[in-house]
Regions:
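An anion-engaging/catalytic patch
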Residues: 1-116
Length: 116
């Protein structure tokens, strides 16, 4: 969890589904199932960003992370989206890691910006 690669999109820190699954020690397919089962609770732009087409090509071109050429849709999760995943998994590990994500991943950028 301490070695998460930092990913930013439009100036906000985000995580990929795989990063969340790895950090929460969960199966990425389970995260996907939970998301699809509760999709009406997730708000695009607030909980996640879905990149496709030109947006995905532009994101790939920036080279922040390797995105397979076979991927035609990439979900990036915000702090609030990571919270919903922790809630749906409801494991001790997910809650523990979520707290660390807030303190050490999502909040770091806002702390740096407020000191400028």
């Amino acid at each position: 969890m301490d070695e998460l690669q930092i990913i930013e999109y439009d100036g906000i820190r985000v995580l990929t589904s795989q990063q969340i699954a790895d950090a929460y020690e969960a199966d990425a397919n389970l995260l996907n199932k939970n998301f699809n089962r509760n999709k009406d609770r997730y708000v695009e732009g607030k909980h996640y960003i879905c990149l496709q087409g030109d947006e995905l090509r532009g994101f790939r071109a920036k080279g922040q992370i390797d995105v397979s050429p076979n991927v035609n849709k990439l979900y990036l999760w915000t702090e609030k989206g990571a919270l919903l995943h922790a809630k749906s998994l409801n494991t001790d590990k997910a809650w523990e890691v979520y707290d660390k994500l807030v303190e050490n991943y999502f909040r770091v950028r806002s702390a740096v910006n407020s000191n400028l």
